[in-house]
Amino acid sequence: MSETLELASALIARRSVTPMDAGCQQLLAERLRPLGFDCERLDYGEVNNLWARRGQQGPVFCFAGHTDVVPPGPEAQWRHPPFQPVVEQGLLYGRGAADMKGSVAAFVTALERYLAGGHRPRGSLALLITSDEEGPAVDGTRHVVETLSERGERIDWCLVGEPSSTERVGDVVKVGRRGSLNGRLTVRGDQGHVAYPHLARNPVHQALAALDELVTTRWDEGNDHFPPTSFQISNVQAGTGATNVIPGELEVTFNFRFSTEVTADELQQRVEAVLDRHGLDGRIDWSLSGEPFLTAEGELVAATQAAVRDVCGDPPVLSTSGGTSDGRFIAPTGAQVLELGPVNATIHKVNEHVRAADLDTLSRIYEGVLRRLLG
């Protein structure tokens, strides 16, 4: 069993369902300290965070990832117990194999080989690991980045180990992500009997025209890197469940996935203008999950493309598709941020797995990035 596979298995065996870390970060620190890393706990609330750094000079290259995993779901449906890693027919099974304990293990073994080779990096090496990526993502990477900023520490290049690949390791690298803005619209009405609508005020009827306008609006045209901004209604709640009662209140939750062509403030203003135009009696509560970010070019992109080509034979596709990641908290500091990790076909599913050999491939790619960026 390779060192990367062995470490990934040891991490999977720790039942670190978000926001728990279950000793994963302690295990990582034990591997990093002998390499010369200063390992600092930046815990916040229930969340465990590890900031490990080797060197004091810039530029700073950082691997970023998480040790928490989503719940396994019905464990009886798993081929093997989700927290008992098993390699079967070349596949490593276990919750977190792809998302993202395999990547975290590859970070460490890439660093071990790189430093064992006698390399003297032109700058500092760092790891930022949290147990709050799969949860609210408030007390994890966001908190660590704020702490580093207060101390005057910055990250120049950041490689996030999210499972970016689709068919084979390294076929897709994420160079950015769309922003995510949530809204909860509450429309007030007057409850009443459906037979006497003149004595009531139906908030559903009030809201229909405004909602239709929001759904059909073209928010922007996108650009070379991002598709047009998307508006999706995710939940609609109204009424008591009875068929003869006009509801007194309507609640609609919705989400924008937005490009760099528009800001969260602009979207909020445009939505509120639509509601005002339709005279709705209500309010909106907004929640910004993250701004869009893009690293379209630069040293990190070039080094990653070259490392993937060296190890895999073909250059990666550069993409901004998919959901949000913790890269959204690091990019606003000015860092170049990319995401590169295992194949994502089974993430969050029963029987999550990766090809065992892929983790060694990933570790070699990570080592190649280090060599090209830091010498």
From Swiss-Prot:
Which UniProt keyword terms apply here?
Amino-acid biosynthesis, Cobalt, Diaminopimelate biosynthesis, Hydrolase, Lysine biosynthesis, Metal-binding, Zinc
Name the gene behind this protein: dapE
Please state what the protein is called: Succinyl-diaminopimelate desuccinylase
Q: Which Pfam families match?
A: M20_dimer (PF07687), Peptidase_M20 (PF01546)
Q: What does this protein do?
A: Catalyzes the hydrolysis of N-succinyl-L,L-diaminopimelic acid (SDAP), forming succinate and LL-2,6-diaminopimelate (DAP), an intermediate involved in the bacterial biosynthesis of lysine and meso-diaminopimelic acid, an essential component of bacterial cell walls.
Q: How is the cofactor bound?
A: Binds 2 Zn(2+) or Co(2+) ions per subunit.
Q: Where does Zn(2+) 2 bind?
A: D99, E134, H348
What is one GO biological process annotated to this record?
diaminopimelate biosynthetic process
**Reaction catalysed by this enzyme:** N-succinyl-(2S,6S)-2,6-diaminopimelate + H2O = (2S,6S)-2,6-diaminopimelate + succinate
Gene Ontology MF annotations: acetylornithine deacetylase activity; cobalt ion binding; succinyl-diaminopimelate desuccinylase activity; zinc ion binding
Part of which pathway?
Amino-acid biosynthesis; L-lysine biosynthesis via DAP pathway; LL-2,6-diaminopimelate from (S)-tetrahydrodipicolinate (succinylase route): step 3/3
Q: Which family does it belong to?
A: Belongs to the peptidase M20A family. DapE subfamily.
Q: Which residues form the active site?
A: D68, E133
The cofactor(s) it depends on are:
Zn(2+); Co(2+)
